[in-house]
Regions:
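Residues at the starts of beta-strands that form the adenosine-phosphate
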Residues: 16, 39-43, 138
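Cofactor-binding loop segments of dinucleotide-utilizing enzymes, especially the Rossmann-like FAD-
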Residues: 22, 47, 144, 195
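Glycine-rich dinucleotide-binding loop and its adjacent helix/turn
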Residues: 1-20, 24-37
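A Rossmann-like FAD-binding core segment of flavoenzymes
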Residues: 36-129, 176
Length: 209
């Protein structure tokens, strides 16, 4: 956002910037910030043991090597408990930070989080393989509100919608539902590392350069 840009531009030389969340947004922000402000200390907090842990290790290594070469510190296995002015708590331990940028993802709206149904630890609705709420089979949950193994995205919601359409079609025709729904496969994504490098994961293939 514009406010974040202004706050970063006003930071003095040697300031510490903590980026919480090492998904695509965090990765791209860290790389762009490094190229625009070489005088800052940048820390990228990742909840997992490696960047983009749900994708091939080749992709993780490529990104990690770029960060290592450009002096961006990746902090794995991070759990940010609390953020205070000038301080961040990672796994209960305080660290001095001049600016925190939160890219750790989104959560469902409050009305969804307060529904009297089973939720994941991230506040998303637990659904069955047909994308239904188990206790309310006439209710389907799609997109950011659904608890799925993939990161929320428009692409994922569209794939869910296609499966739900098939489920509804069978129900309207009084046909039995399949014992096992096909696994949802996200087609891929693109990411950048600064102005001149990038990466892609398309149809189970990793492309870097």
């Amino acid at each position: 956002s514009r406010e974040t840009y202004h706050r970063i531009s006003e930071l003095p030389k040697g300031a510490r910037v903590g980026i919480v969340g090492a998904g695509l947004s965090g990765i791209e922000l860290a790389s762009e910030l490094r190229e625009s402000r070489s005088d800052l200390e940048i820390l990228l907090y990742d909840r997992g043991p490696r960047i983009l842990r749900n994708f091939p290790e080749k992709l993780s290594k490529y990104i990690s090597n770029w960060f290592s070469k450009h002096n961006v510190t990746v902090v794995p296995n991070s759990v940010i408990d609390k953020v205070e002015p000038g301080k961040i708590y990672n796994n209960g331990k305080p660290e001095n930070i001049d600016l925190v940028v939160w890219t750790a993802g989104i959560q469902p709206v409050e009305i969804v989080r307060n529904l009297p149904i089973d939720m994941s630890t991230t506040g998303r609705v637990i659904i069955n393989q047909y994308h239904q709420v188990p206790t309310y089979r006439n209710v389907y949950v799609v997109g950011d509100c659904a608890n799925l193994p993939h990161a929320p995205s428009a692409q994922l919601a569209e794939l869910q919608g296609e499966q739900i359409a098939e489920v509804l079609k069978k129900q309207w025709n009084n046909e039995p539902l399949p014992d096992k729904m096909p696994e949802i496969k996200v087609q891929g994504f693109l990411g950048s590392l600064g102005d001149k490098q990038g990466f892609a994961y398309i149809m189970d293939r990793t492309v870097t350069g």
